[in-house]
């Protein structure tokens, strides 16, 4: 439900981008309008959406593609292409797991121990979590935020 509301809100805000493009704003300004006005709607609580299904990912990416079409319609090409929303969500999830390694982090207890702390020895892969993929009996749990974030962190 949250993703549908985010897509709906961002789609409504695309109108502002269209109006600004019609008035001849340069593409750099249109990109900054997109990143300050529209993308926050799509990325609100994005760490929690890292495990969303393919259909929901496509809905979110569709809004960004529409914004890129509006921006590039006037200029032809953007000097720096916008990163996909999925890659930004994955980066945020990995950052969350890194932050959770801190003993003072409120969610620290949810992480499994690292391989180095479990064995007590210096290992090449000691930064990885001991369980490469947390055990999950259902796909819903397997695609949940924490499980997906741990899986992405271990893939680094």
Q: Where do the protein language model's features map onto the residues?
A:
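Hydrophobic/basic alpha-helical segments
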Residues: 1-156
